[in-house]
Curated annotation (Swiss-Prot):
Protein purpose: Redox regulated molecular chaperone. Protects both thermally unfolding and oxidatively damaged proteins from irreversible aggregation. Plays an important role in the bacterial defense system toward oxidative stress.
Posttranslational modification: Under oxidizing conditions two disulfide bonds are formed involving the reactive cysteines. Under reducing conditions zinc is bound to the reactive cysteines and the protein is inactive.
GO biological process, one term: protein refolding
Record-given protein name: 33 kDa chaperonin
Disulphide bond pairs: 225-227, 258-261
Main location as per UniProt: cytoplasm
Compartments where found: Cytoplasm
Protein keywords: Chaperone, Cytoplasm, Disulfide bond, Redox-active center, Zinc
A GO molecular-function descriptor: protein folding chaperone
Species per Swiss-Prot/TrEMBL record: Shewanella loihica (strain ATCC BAA-1088 / PV-4)
Similarity annotation: Belongs to the HSP33 family.
Gene Ontology CC: cytoplasm
Pfam families assigned: HSP33
Length: 286
């Protein structure tokens, strides 16, 4: 089956919309940059599926960041993306992590931060505590807090594939929607293996074969890193040239690495001189 696809669907006889995302290649590309423990690889997969679903649900043109932060072994896990379903992500951790570690065991006390940066308009940030047992439940809580919309989310990842489903009452409709409750019960029966192995059309038929479902054109999800030599150079220009010269004197070059994709950009003394030519001097005062 085709992987790395987001499908949106709508129920003709209910004020409810849904999405299903299935990921493989893009998920593997995110994991390839680091050797992640199994539990963290699963967390990144769930976070990636969640970000794809959120991007399509919130309907905006611009960038999105979904991150979880905590005081546990994992201090940060983040997926960045945009409305074109181009995603990248990384996690930071210390120490040993059990294979079957739960969200709380990974993150400790923490919170989820969802940041939207539209191409046109004001930046928005929503925060929800990581007080639920699963990432999916935390996201459901986010929608209740920020959108006041009943939402059901299912997220799965196994280190090879990631997938998710989102079901939501349409904005402006009755929050106490019996049709939504019925469809939520049907959706809750989905198994990880079904989302990993079946086409979206088969999944929807298994879940909702007695409902009238309208499936929209699929949207491709890809791994895409926004790092570049130019951006690395711009970052170096925020450092005092004297500090860079000291590094060059000791090491002969400056390496700028991207933690998202493991790309590395090398700058020698000629490169640094060119960066600072005609540039204003950095303010080194604190």
């Amino acid at each position: 089956m085709s992987k790395d696809i987001l499908n949106r669907y709508l129920f003709d006889n209910a004020d409810v919309r849904g999405q299903i995302v299935q990921l493989e290649k893009s998920y593997q590309e995110i994991l390839s940059a680091h050797t992640y423990p199994e539990a963290i690889a699963r967390l990144l997969g769930e976070l990636m599926a969640a970000t794809s679903l959120l991007t399509a649900t919130l309907k905006f043109d611009g960038d999105i960041s979904v991150q979880v932060q905590g005081n546990g072994p994992v201090s940060l896990a983040v997926i960045n993306g945009n409305n074109l379903q181009q995603l990248r992500g990384v996690a930071r951790w210390e120490g040993e992590v059990a294979k079957d570690a739960s969200l709380q065991q990974l993150m400790g006390q923490g919170h989820m931060v969802i940041t939207l940066t539209p191409n046109n308009g004001e930046r928005y940030q929503g925060v929800v505590a990581l007080e639920k047992e699963t990432l999916a439940e935390c996201l459901e809580q986010y929608f209740l807090q920020s959108e006041q919309l009943p939402t059901a989310i299912r997220l799965f990842a196994n280190g090879k594939q990631a997938a998710g489903m989102l079901l939501q009452v349409l904005p402006g409709e009755d929050e106490h929607n019996e049709e939504f409750e019925h469809l939520e019960q049907l959706t809750s029966t989905i198994k990880a293996e079904e989302l990993f192995e079946l086409e979206a059309t088969e999944v929807l038929h298994r879940l909702y074969h007695q409902e009238e479902v309208r499936l929209f054109d699929p949207i491709e999800v890809t791994f895409s890193c926004t790092c570049s030599r130019e951006r690395s150079g711009q970052a170096l220009k925020t450092v005092a040239k004297e500090e860079l010269d000291a590094i060059l004197a000791e090491q002969g070059k400056i390496e700028m690495g991207c933690e998202y994709c493991n790309s590395s950009y090398s700058f020698d003394s000629i490169d640094i001189e060119a960066l600072f030519k005609n540039a204003p001097k950095a303010d080194t005062q604190q």
